[in-house]
Amino acid sequence: SAITTSDAGAGIGYTTLRIRGTDGTRINVTANGIPINDAESHTVFWVNLPDFASSVKDLQVQRGAGTSTNGAGAFGGSINMQTGDFSLKPYAEINASYGSFNTHKETVKVGTGLINEHWSFDVRLSNISSDGYIDRASVGLNSYYAQGGYYNDNTSVKLITFGGKERTYHAWNYASKDQMAVFGRRFNSCRIHVYWRIKAEGYINRRLITDYGGQKKPIKADQNGGTFHFYDDQTDNYVQKNYHLLVNHTFTPQWRLNAGLHYTTGDGYYQEYKIGRKLVEYGMKPYEVSGENVTKSDLVRKKAMDNWFGGGIFSVSYTNDRLNASLGGGLNRYDGDHFGKVLWVKNYLGQLNPD
């Protein structure tokens, strides 16, 4: 069995996949034999591959313990996606769809067909957007896919590039039963400038609200959430670009070679409003407000990262009436950096350290 979930509740944006109860860190995912799993966390961030399915011709799922072509063990399963082959004739497609919560997708695909009996080129552009089922859980995704190839009777060489850009509002806190009892199933506490305490009976006993330059003040409970304030730029932003060079060659009817080179870059950040954080956690000293020493404060932080992942894989196979044998290998390298900034601290009078 396979289960998918999404933070926004509409199947768009940050999504997860489980196979037989196993999470994505134990599921190996490849595209044309190239590893797709994040090299650092070993999960797959599907949000960085918007509408990739529109360029996939075949998808194979192997459940349970096994191995995949990237060499790492998979306890939950393996998924291999094969992208589309070249088209013999030129074509152009425009597809659009619309659904609940202002969810829509637009896709444009064009291809040259076979040129001079050996060359072919294809391009896809996609846009996906949704307001989300969860409050304020909007999603904006853009993606591209392009491939060019040379083909003859025994050899094919294909260069593929694809990538995506995502901007998603945070919706990963989820609502507790007490919160849903007061504010409904679609309540989203991310980006909230509010402290609250909810009694077991399921109503608000006290809420304190704060805003830029303001003071915390007790306010009347509003079950519709109209008195809540939110940090508007609490978003996740990421751009990923992938490059694959694939070579297939048939030496004889029995011997065949498959090889590939790959390179992936990623760059992104997210910002969030944090309430009552210790200043020492961010390398800042306490400060005084009206004669009182302040060691905790509300702040806005920005967490960023950039990374690259590259390598190569190969396999040689031999097949006859009695034997199927293959030998392969791969070599990969990953380099990533995490860094951050404090963008704003409530009532802070000193100089903010940029890092």
What is each residue range found by the language model?
Residues 156-246, 270-302:
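Acidic/polar loop-and-plug regions of large Gram-negative outer-membrane beta-barrel proteins
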Residues 98-129, 134-173, 182-201, 243-253:
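Transmembrane beta-barrel wall of Gram-negative outer-membrane proteins
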